[in-house]
């Protein structure tokens, strides 16, 4: 399965020179947020691959202009596509008074808890799709680009194979990796665009998901 991950900055190669040939072979497009509505809608003209997205902290215009047409919002969902189980949690850490798609740690933990039963019913998750990174895992030094500590708990409890995020542009720090590993999880920074391939999901080989409510206490 070939996946194109995009985030934060429209790719010139896609925005100015997109074609069906350029997106040939792409099975799924994942957007980590902070992309113009018209950019996502534009890409739908060149591919039959579904475009799944979560919101970024700069996507407030979606609330006034409407969500991107032809795309699927997976924010606060466990979305299963061809056996691939995707948990979506958009938004950034709250760093100013803007109300749109910014969350405190407590608020994000509550969102995570609300997804627990959906994840259990799906038998777990394979891919975590977010806008922000996890705290201490290739996040930024400034308040606006700090990651969520609760995402570390989620990675430990759910152990997804892939964690795809944006928010922290690679241009911010030359030492930021595009791809790294954290335990059993491959972590991908999707800023602008990144293409990767994964094995086709095998539902038969899935491990049984835990029944216990994961230890995600509501805390600051």
Regions found by a protein language model. Give the residues of each.
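Active-site neighborhood of phospho(di)ester-bond hydrolases with catalytic His/Asp-centered motifs
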Residues: 5-7, 28-34, 52-57, 74, ...
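Binuclear metal-dependent phosphoesterase catalytic core
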Residues: 6, 65, 78-82, 154-158, ...
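A generic local structural motif
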Residues: 14-20, 37-41, 72-74, 113-117, ...
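Conserved beta-strand segments of alpha/beta enzyme cores
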Residues: 2, 50-52, 72, 85, ...
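N-terminal active-site segment of His-dependent metallophosphoesterases
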Residues: 1-46, 116-124, 220
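Active-site environment of divalent metal-dependent phosphoester hydrolases
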Residues: 10-14, 35-41, 57-64, 94-98, ...
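A short, gly/pro- and small-residue-rich
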Residues: 47-58, 148-151
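Conserved catalytic scaffold of divalent metal-dependent phosphoesterases
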Residues: 5-14, 58-146, 192, 213-216
């Amino acid at each position: 399965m070939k996946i194109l991950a995009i985030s934060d900055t429209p790719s010139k190669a896609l925005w100015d020179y997109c074609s069906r040939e350029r997106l040939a072979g792409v099975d799924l497009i994942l957007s980590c947020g902070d992309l113009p509505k018209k950019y996502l809608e534009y890409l739908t003209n060149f591919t039959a691959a579904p475009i799944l997205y979560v919101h970024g902290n700069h996507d407030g215009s979606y609330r006034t202009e409407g969500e991107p047409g032809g795309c699927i919002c997976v924010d606060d969902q466990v979305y299963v596509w061809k056996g691939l189980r995707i948990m979506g949690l958009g938004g950034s850490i709250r760093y100013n008074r803007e109300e749109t798609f910014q969350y405190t740690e407590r608020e994000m933990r509550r969102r995570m808890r609300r997804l627990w039963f959906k994840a259990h019913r799906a038998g777990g998750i394979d891919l975590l799709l977010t806008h922000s990174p996890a705290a201490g895992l290739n996040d930024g030094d400034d308040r606006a680009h700090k990651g969520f500590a609760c995402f570390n708990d989620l990675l430990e409890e759910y152990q997804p194979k892939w964690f795809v995020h944006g928010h922290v542009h690679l241009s911010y720090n030359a030492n930021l990796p595009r791809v790294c590993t954290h335990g059993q999880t491959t972590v991908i920074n999707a800023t602008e665009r990144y293409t990767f391939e994964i094995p086709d999901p095998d539902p038969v080989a899935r491990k049984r998901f835990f029944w216990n409510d994961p230890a995600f206490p509501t805390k600051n």
